[in-house]
From Swiss-Prot:
It comes from the Eukaryota. The gene is trpp-3. This is Trafficking protein particle complex subunit 3 homolog. The keyword Endoplasmic reticulum applies. A lipid is attached at C70 (S-palmitoyl cysteine). InterPro entries: Bet3, NO_sig/Golgi_transp_ligand-bd, TRAPP_component.
Length: 181
């Protein structure tokens, strides 16, 4: 493949990322008009992210067959920071601030593609808007798809975005009502 073609592919990916950021900002703006309460918008962003995450888990596992089965939260954090977040967001992430016996940690995104082209008004943040909650919801959905129930919340602080993740339980497979083993 020639350098020109590779450069055009890289540029098209960058353009689609910028388009996504602008579209996301417009969507959040419309949601703020529709719901009026920024806390309700945060809840809706979380739900949307959760639905995306359940589908991204299948895509991630299909593309990354060499990822080992995670048995603890440190392994989950490692796979999220080294594989999943760079793959889908194109940014690096680190896990830190372990607490509650390794059941709670914070993932820090050094640059958040959702916030590159926007400035969220401080009054909306103080009223309960978590602009990047869709990312936290996607992580929650992806982990639930692989049978880990977690709570996730996002907070944008200047240049970084912090996603607090708290492990709740390992979910058991269950058959639909009326079906036997």
């Amino acid at each position: 493949m020639s350098k020109a073609i590779k450069q055009n592919l890289a540029d098209s990916k960058k353009m689609s990322a910028e388009l996504f950021c602008l579209t996301y900002g417009a969507m959040v703006t419309e949601m703020l008009k529709d719901y009026e309460d920024p806390k309700d918008v945060t809840v809706q962003l979380d739900k949307m992210g959760f639905n995306m995450g359940t589908r991204l888990a299948d895509d991630f596992l299909a593309k990354n067959a060499n990822v080992p089965r995670c048995v603890d939260t440190r392994q989950i954090a490692d796979v999220l920071c080294r594989n999943a977040i760079p793959c889908y967001l194109g940014v690096s992430a680190t896990a830190s601030s372990w607490s509650s016996g390794d059941r709670e940690f914070i993932i820090t995104l050094e640059s958040n593609p959702l916030t590159e082209l926007v400035q969220v008004p401080p009054n909306l943040v103080s009223a309960g808007l978590s602009y990047s909650q869709m990312i936290a919801g996607a992580i929650r959905g992806a982990l639930e798809a692989v049978h880990f129930k977690v709570y996730a919340s996002a907070a944008d602080s200047g240049a970084n975005t912090e996603i607090r993740i708290r492990f709740d339980q390992v979910l058991k497979d269950s058959l639909p009502a009326g079906e036997d083993d």
